[in-house]
Amino acid sequence: MADPIPPITLPPATSPEQEGLWLQATLHQWLDNEFLPEAVNGDIAARASQVFVRQRMEGENDLGSLVIAILTEMQGFDFSQSFYGEFAIANAVSDLLLDSLGIDRCCGAS
């Protein structure tokens, strides 16, 4: 059996608002590129970014906890006009953050 991947901790937030702007723009671009550009993609990216920023401002640095918070709060979002759902959004945020840190999404190695 493979060894479990250790938890991934983000560096402490020095500018959560700036991180949020980056995440919002990057997630919106990812959503538009993954399937079709849709008007709702901007709303999805804004909401996920809002949750992320709030969590970071509260001191959350654990990637798994951030993803669960986004997943949980995105369950209340109306995805009826989108190809996506809360799981796809939470996973995309995780992938984008891992990419930004230079961490291999497959195996957790830098």
Which residues make up each language-model segment?
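Amphipathic alpha-helical protein-protein interaction segments
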Residues: 13-16, 60-64, 82-86
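Protein-protein interaction and targeting regions used for scaffolding, dimerization, and localization
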Residues: 8, 12, 58-61, 77
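Amphipathic alpha-helical binding modules
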Residues: 73-110
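Amphipathic alpha-helical interaction modules
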Residues: 25-70
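Short terminal alpha-helical segments
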Residues: 1-38
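Amphipathic alpha-helical segments in structured regions that serve as interaction surfaces
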Residues: 19, 44-48, 70, 92-97
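Intrinsically disordered, low-complexity regions
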Residues: 5-7, 28, 49, 54, ...
